[in-house]
């Protein structure tokens, strides 16, 4: 399963299930808690880039001056309402943001994106994460913030994911609509910080009773997945 194959499956799945996904993140308690954390992090930001937006705003758009919503699939996402007045859509891949102005944004946010950047192997998937973070750092102004909201797992579960990744990804690809994912421990995401960026904040977002797993509401206590906010500051 190549990165290109994963991108296509992500497009098909999230385009088809956009309305249901919006409803779930709007009503499930885990994402209500997540929204409060995001709102606090973006409040007062002048220029915000939301990379991997997918047509879903998991925060109050009024808290930022202007928002550039970036996604590879924006042209294929049906829109049931007009965008907020301060939002500009841009079609681009997080793995290649060459068409996006460099050193332009005060903050860049990625919400539940990194675990979807899977490749043929677990190693290729982590390379995609590194590339995505580097691309996002390039469009940040000096002293800008890279805000990552991500589903993480304990190290023991990550080792399990690595051991079964290729057969599990093949089975998922053949059997369900949702694309395969690879979740990382918090320490691994901190480890792959882009050059010139320093960790400013790591905040655990308390799980509620329900959390999405492969697009399906799932009891929070039955999964090791843990939402977290990680903020990098561009220092160079």
Put a short name on every predicted segment.
Residues 1-19:
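N-terminal, positively charged/glycine-rich alpha-helical extensions of SAM-dependent methyltransferases
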Residues 27-45:
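Conserved alpha-helix/loop element of class I SAM-dependent methyltransferases that forms part
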Residues 49-97:
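Class I SAM-dependent methyltransferase SAM/SAH-binding core
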Residues 95-108:
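A short acidic, Gly/Pro-enriched loop at the edge of an enzyme's catalytic core
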Residues 107-127:
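A short SAM/SAH-binding and catalytic strip from SAM-dependent methyltransferases
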Residues 126-142:
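A short glycine-rich, Lys/Arg-flanked "PGG" loop and its adjoining helix->strand segment in the class I
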Residues 148-196, 200-212:
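C-terminal alpha-helical "lid/dimerization" subdomain adjacent to the S-adenosyl-L-methionine
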Residues 196-197, 214-236:
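Core SAM-dependent methyltransferase catalytic element
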